[in-house]
From Swiss-Prot:
SUPFAM superfamilies per UniProt: ALDH-like
Entry GO MF terms: aldehyde dehydrogenase [NAD(P)+] activity; succinylglutamate-semialdehyde dehydrogenase activity
Descriptive protein name: N-succinylglutamate 5-semialdehyde dehydrogenase
Protein source organism: Escherichia coli O7:K1 (strain IAI39 / ExPEC)
Keywords: Arginine metabolism, NAD, Oxidoreductase
Superkingdom: Bacteria
Keyword NAD: yes
Length: 492
């Protein structure tokens, strides 16, 4: 029984799904997808639970969420192993994900009060008040790269605001989704407040097509996000929050410490085997001898990166990709770039057939035209050289995406220029592109999305503002507008 609907664990009525470790092939989880009828059942359960959940005090909802945080802490080792085994990422990185889940809860509580709490302004004849109200029933679609942390970036603020939820994890990480849901169950959520439906495309389409949804919160690829946007077009009554991918530029303008700049670049491009939406996909490197030296050092250090199993000792920097298919897609993308005229500096290699262990790749594309503006979700870095900083900014902005952007330079003036001209939601200076503060908004513009999940601004799309003018009594104004006559004399 792998679906949680209305407080009960039930068996899916859809197709059988089997999840294997992407490196060893070990069977980790199996269960049946939710069919359309079960998706509808989950929605009805969420709708029935909504009035009572929304009417609880914020403190009562907070108690449950903080209880969940405590369960994350006490089950950290077990959840770390589940996430690592299912995604293929190393144990150390999965542990940081669980820690982020825990830390984000206190931040979400504070964000609710600061961004969507209550305000009151006294007026001579009463008061003006601002309150926030939950939308109702929300669908949450989770990604596979951070199957615990990123869905919770939607779920926690949505629950705090008083919404009820239908959660569909990625079909590639059903085990992590179930493990997190069992902790929510232990936290004492009332039946129907949070429901779990497992499945792939058919389940997702059934969920997004529900008429009784009040909104949909999504983290994932731009292609799927665009499909959801089209599906919900013409329905302004539904909130749609999209956090999608990026074709992110990292500008290396000048680096006094080449090794430090190489370290920053590797952290930006290859951490999580390149499976972060903020990863650097495009390296924009200043022409000249220093750029040549940097590039040679980057290739030399990157070729030492050997992906390993989740529990290898010593621990590897990167593990496998989410699947063998995902790894092969990166190799195919590299081969296509070579065919277009790219010059391979470091070829990505599948270490073992039937696994997702893929070494990083670096390819120079300077002078090549017609390069697709797409996100290759893996450890593949494309390099372009530029002559001046204005050209670098133009190249950085030459994308339909707008998630993250970074600059390596000792010059504050150049960073100030980038802040003014960059089209990206995250702009870092001498910091990895993959670094983001949990107390800051997370997200981008253009094809990268429309709202800011998993952090400070998530509260904004989980509740709607209600403005009120209030007075505890009603009296006739001392001064009336022209044309109004409330005298006792009857005019005939």
């Amino acid at each position: 029984m792998t679906l949680w609907i209305n407080g009960d664990w039930v068996t899916g009525q859809g197709a059988l799904r089997v999840k294997r470790n992407p490196v060893s092939g070990e069977v980790l989880w199996q269960g049946n997808d939710a069919d359309a009828a079960q998706v509808g059942q989950a929605c009805r359960a969420a709708r029935a639970a909504f009035p009572r959940w929304a009417r609880l005090s914020f403190g009562d909802r907070q108690v449950r969420v903080e209880r969940f945080a405590g369960l994350l802490e006490s089950n950290k080792a077990e959840l770390t192993a589940i996430i690592a085994r299912e995604t293929g990422k190393p144990r150390w990185e999965a542990a940081t994900e669980v820690t982020a889940m825990i830390n984000k809860i206190a931040i979400s509580i504070k964000a609710y009060h600061v961004r969507t709490g209550e305000q009151r302004s006294e007026m001579p004849d009463g008061a003006a008040s601002l309150r926030h109200r939950p939308h109702g029933v929300l669908a949450v679609f989770g990604p596979y790269n951070f199957p615990g942390h990123l869905p919770n970036g939607h779920i926690v603020p949505a629950l705090l605001a008083g919404n009820t939820i239908i959660f569909k994890p990625s079909e590639l990480t059903p085990w992590s989704g179930e493990a997190v849901m069992r902790l929510w169950q232990q936290a004492g959520l009332p039946p129907g407040v949070l429901n779990l439906v497992q499945g792939g495309r058919e389940t997702g389409q059934a969920l997004s097509a529900l008429e009784d949804l009040d909104g949909l919160l999504f983290t994932g690829s731009a292609n799927t996000g665009y499909q959801l946007h089209r599906q919900l077009s013409g329905q302004p009554e539904k909130i749609l929050a999209l956090e999608m991918g990026g074709n992110n530029p990292l500008i290396i303008d000048e680096a006094a410490d080449i090794d430090a700049a190489v370290h920053l670049t590797i952290q930006s491009a290859f951490v999580t085997a390149g499976q972060r939406c903020t990863c650097a996909r495009r390296l924009l490197l200043k022409s000249g001898a220093q750029g040549d030296a940097f590039l040679a050092r980057l290739v030399a250090v990157s070729q030492r990166l050997t992906p390993g199993r989740w529990d290898d000792e010593p621990q590897p920097f990167i593990g496998g990709l989410i699947s063998e298919q995902a790894a092969q897609q990166v190799v195919t993308a590299w081969q296509q770039l070579e065919t277009m005229g790219g010059r391979t500096l470091l070829a990505p290699r599948l270490l073992q057939a039937g696994t997702s262990l893929l070494t990083p790749g670096i390819i120079e594309m300077t002078g090549v035209t017609g390069v697709p503006d797409e996100e290759v979700f893996g450890p593949l870095l494309r390099v372009w050289r530029y002559d001046n900083f204005d050209e670098a900014i133009r190249m950085a902005n030459n994308t339909r995406f707008g998630l993250s952007c970074g600059l390596v330079s000792p010059e504050r003036e150049k960073f100030d220029q980038l802040l003014l001209e960059a089209r990206a939601g995250i702009v870092n200076w001498n910091k990895p592109l993959t670094g983001a503060a949990s107390t800051a908004p997370f997200g981008g513009i253009g094809a990268s999305g429309n709202h800011r999940p998993s952090g400070w601004y998530a509260a904004d799309y989980c509740a709607w503002p209600m403005a009120s003018l209030e007075s505890d009594s009603l009296t006739l104004p001392a001064t009336l507008n022209p044309g109004l006559d409330f005298s006792d004399e009857v005019v005939r």
